Regions:
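An alpha-beta-alpha
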Residues: 13-75
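Flexible loop/hinge segments that line or gate small-molecule binding clefts
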Residues: 1-17
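Short hydrophobic/aromatic-rich motifs at helix boundaries and adjacent loops
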Residues: 3-4, 28-32, 83
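Intrinsically disordered/low-complexity terminal segments and short unstructured peptides
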Residues: 1, 40-42, 181
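Extracellular/periplasmic bilobed ligand-binding domains
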Residues: 52-156
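Extracellular/periplasmic ligand-binding modules, especially the Venus flytrap/periplasmic-binding
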Residues: 107-109, 145-182
Length: 182
């Protein structure tokens, strides 16, 4: 990432949708994607919305029920001076995978800080549906998010490949990963 991480406040406010409640299909898919990667440890990060908090809490329970380890849970605000403290903590534990959820505005600010200031890798990250939209990915820039993968609300998979967000076709839950996108 070559531009400073902080986005203009008006752009972030327009993207500050609190997000819908996570669906069971979405939670199942996020869990499946993480287990498929054969990860033992995760660090979970989320915005402070009720939906993001509930989604990541449910994921953490499922993860630990599988005998896996949650190294840390980091929350971030929608607006902050720089997100440096949260980004540093999120990346510090060096987990096998990172899991992210939250409203797009705060997530974009946090993600831009991660890219600018830490060794965080999008390709080792799985995200919930609210982050797999053109709007959310566009705030960070798809070219900055190679191999970021996540679940759709209907239990499908979305991924960022070659600078583009790839989602299942409408009406088909499908897997964005017929070509290895998970």
């Amino acid at each position: 990432m070559t531009t400073p991480p902080r986005l203009p406040a008006d752009l972030v406010r327009r993207a500050a949708d609190a997000g819908a409640e996570v669906t069971e299909a979405e939670l199942d898919r996020v869990t499946e994607l993480a287990l498929r990667r054969d990860a033992r440890t995760v660090t979970i990060g989320h915005g402070r919305s009720a939906a993001a908090t509930a989604a990541t809490s449910a994921f953490a329970r499922r993860w630990e029920d599988q005998g896996r380890i949650v190294l840390d849970v980091v929350t971030w605000p929608e607006e902050a001076a720089s997100w440096l403290r949260q980004a540093t903590r999120f990346a510090a534990a060096h987990p096998d995978l990172w899991v992210m959820a939250g409203p797009p505005g705060g997530w974009a600010q946090m993600t831009r800080r991660l890219l600018w200031s830490t060794p965080w890798e999008p390709g080792r990250t799985i995200a919930f549906a609210a982050l797999g939209t053109e709007r959310a990915v566009g705030l960070v820039g798809a070219g900055n998010l190679p191999c970021l993968t996540g679940a759709t609300a209907r239990g499908g998979t979305w991924a960022v490949r070659d600078g583009q967000l790839i989602r299942p076709r409408r009406g088909r839950p499908g897997r964005a990963c017929a070509a290895g996108l998970t």
